[in-house]
């Protein structure tokens, strides 16, 4: 298989815990998955944006209103995109293994006006392991957040902080464990945040120790279509899907 990602992409993920990759999927792949998500969730439509103007950004259930585990009642395009050969290859290289397992995959549609999608910075390891992330990065996992609609800053892209940037903050992990919603923690991370905005087909690959957050959809009538998939090393029982 000819790789559509580079060694530098793998090295960047291993060092920074996050990398943006484009041109993995063909235009046909992108359109087919978009059309499938449209079939599953497209009876909905975006409205006027909702914005909470005070207090810390809190995750709420409505942010996951259209977040469904795959497989779904649609064509193979959506149901199989999370195990695309390029993703499997990248996951193997990133985790330094020849044997991996998919342990969760979802389709995710967001529509403007359903809620304020803004979140605080957080790490995902609480949903993926009963422990804390391993210092051996290959014993953690890799998550792919893939966009199947064009995502500008008005369409609610995820924002993130690289590992090396977060490590500039003294005792950042302890601060997060002590109080993940502490506004001072959020203020320390904010200067380092980066965007995942990109055209349909953009992939955000990140680790469970990476600080990231959702942002609000502010363009009236807009939507964001995405798919997630998560991989771990085979026989790594410390990683799993905990809802």
Predicted feature descriptions by range:
Residues 1-15, 22-129:
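Non-heme Fe(II)-dependent double-stranded beta-helix
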Residues 3, 43, 47-51, 90, ...:
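Non-heme Fe(II)/2-oxoglutarate
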Residues 92-101, 134-138, 148-155, 167:
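Secondary-structure boundary elements
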Residues 105-107, 144-146, 227-231:
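A structural signal for short, well-ordered beta-strand segments
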Residues 106, 123-125, 146-150, 162:
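Short, structured patches in soluble enzyme cores that scaffold and shape functional sites
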Residues 114-121, 130-133, 154-163, 169-173, ...:
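A short secondary-structure junction signal
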Residues 128-135, 191-192:
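Short, P/G- and charge-enriched loop/turn segments at secondary-structure junctions
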Residues 138-141, 151-211, 236:
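Double-stranded beta-helix
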